[in-house]
UniProtKB/Swiss-Prot annotation:
This protein's GO CC annotations: nucleus
Gene field: CEBPA
Organism whose genome encodes this protein: Bos taurus (Bovine)
Domain bZIP: 277-340
InterPro entries: bZIP (IPR004827), bZIP_sf (IPR046347), C/EBP (IPR031106), C/EBP_chordates (IPR016468)
Cross-link (Glycyl lysine isopeptide (Lys-Gly) (interchain with G-Cter in SUMO2)): 159
SUPFAM superfamilies: Leucine zipper domain
Region (Basic motif), start-end ranges: 281-308
Region annotation (Interaction with FOXO1) ranges: 240-353
Protein name: CCAAT/enhancer-binding protein alpha
Protein task: Transcription factor that coordinates proliferation arrest and the differentiation of myeloid progenitors, adipocytes, hepatocytes, and cells of the lung and the placenta. Binds directly to the consensus DNA sequence 5'-T[TG]NNGNAA[TG]-3' acting as an activator on distinct target genes. During early embryogenesis, plays essential and redundant functions with CEBPB. Essential for the transition from common myeloid progenitors (CMP) to granulocyte/monocyte progenitors (GMP). Critical for the proper development of the liver and the lung.
Positions of the UniProt region annotated as Disordered: 1-56, 176-197, 213-278
Residue positions where Phosphoserine is found in the record: 230
GO biological process: DNA-templated transcription; fat cell differentiation; glucose homeostasis; granulocyte differentiation; lipid homeostasis; liver development; lung development; myeloid cell differentiation
Length: 353
């Protein structure tokens, strides 16, 4: 096991000595004496700090400046990391009473008039307090940064996101889509404008559409064009309120009354027929003849189907009887071959060969 490296150095001077404040005398509580009862000799001046070059000369140092981006050293560098700890320290300093004595007083020290701590108290500090005073003094040096307004300390800067991008986007959108007042609506019961007056309206719409055109990249799909409203009146509406052939037909019949007797072409209205006329009688006779013919054809097809079924049934019975006859002959031949001896079978096979 290697021993830990300890370095001998003079006691660290208080922070107030670097800010041109009167040097503080070493507290007698650090040596186990009550306050105000120390030796009579004057306090020794603080020792001059040793040059930094003589500290840890035998240790190895690494230069990491090559690995750090120089652009990262700005006023906001590591500000977010120390924000929380400094806020806690400021909150503690603000919570302390205004005349609450000094940072080096122990909690049980009596308080005199005006909030000042009585030096030494009536009975002195508790035993053993002087042994821990040195470590306590070293650990309470941090609040001096807050008590003394040091000019070298920078104020805490909170990083905020830039908002110039939002303003630039708004300006760009305003340049792409300028406000265009809508054209005044036409008065009611107005006739459609003639052809020579409709051209400026169309040019205005084309110009308006050209101003609001979006510039897309080659990879994006092109949106469908916006339909331009026509200045001409809408077509006639049909029976259901929709434009269609029915509405146009009604308008045509209204303008030409002589078309009503003709049935209206493709309309669903039935034609009025006189049942006592010869034409109606001839038509009914032709229809009856066609119906009789279709019925006779259906009956004939039915009779033909029945005859075909009878023929197929008779053929099936005849084939079944033939199969039964052949099966009986086969059984008879098998019985004959079983009764013959094997020698005769061999001779018969030899004669056949």
């Amino acid at each position: 096991m290697e021993s830990a490296d300890f370095y001998e150095a003079e006691p660290r001077p208080p922070m107030s000595s670097h800010l041109q404040s009167p040097p503080h005398a070493p507290s007698s509580a650090a040596f186990g004496f009550p306050r105000g009862a120390g030796p009579s000799q004057p306090p020794a001046p603080p020792a001059a700090p040793e040059p930094l070059g003589g500290i840890c000369e035998h240790e190895t140092s690494i230069d990491i400046s090559a690995y750090i981006d120089p652009a990262a050293f700005n006023d906001e560098f590591l500000a977010d990391l120390f924000q929380h700890s400094r806020q806690q320290e400021k909150a503690k300093a603000a919570a302390a009473p205004a005349g609450g004595g000094n940072d080096f007083d122990y909690p049980g020290a009596p308080v005199g008039p005006g909030g000042a701590v009585m030096p030494g108290g009536t009975h002195g500090p508790p035993p053993g307090y002087g042994c821990a005073a040195a470590g306590y003094l070293d650990s309470r040096l941090e609040p001096l940064y807050e008590r003394v307004g040091a000019p070298a300390l920078r104020p805490l800067v909170i990083k905020q996101e830039p908002r110039e991008e939002d303003e630039a986007k708004q300006l760009a959108l305003a340049g792409l889509f300028p406000y265009q007042p809508p054209p005044p609506p036409p008065p009611p019961n107005s006739h459609p404008p003639p052809a020579h007056l409709a051209a400026p309206h169309l040019q205005f719409q084309i110009a308006h559409c050209g101003q609001t055109t979006m510039h897309l990249q080659p990879g994006h799909p092109t949106p469908p064009p916006t339909p331009v409203p026509s200045p001409h009146p809408a077509p006639a509406l049909g029976a259901a309120g929709l434009p269609g052939p029915g509405g146009a037909l009604k308008g045509l019949v209204a303008t030409h009354p002589d078309l009503r007797a003709g049935g209206g072409g493709g309309g669903k209205a039935k034609k009025s027929v006189d049942k006592n006329s010869n034409e109606y009688r001839v038509r009914r006779e032709r229809n009856n003849i066609a119906v009789r013919k279709s019925r006779d054809k259906a009956k004939q097809r039915n009779v033909e189907t029945q005859q075909k079924v009878l023929e197929l049934t008779s053929d099936n019975d005849r084939l079944r009887k033939r199969v039964e006859q052949l099966s009986r002959e086969l059984d008879t031949l098998r019985g004959i071959f079983r009764q013959l001896p094997e020698s005769s079978l061999v001779k018969a096979m030899g004669n056949c060969a």
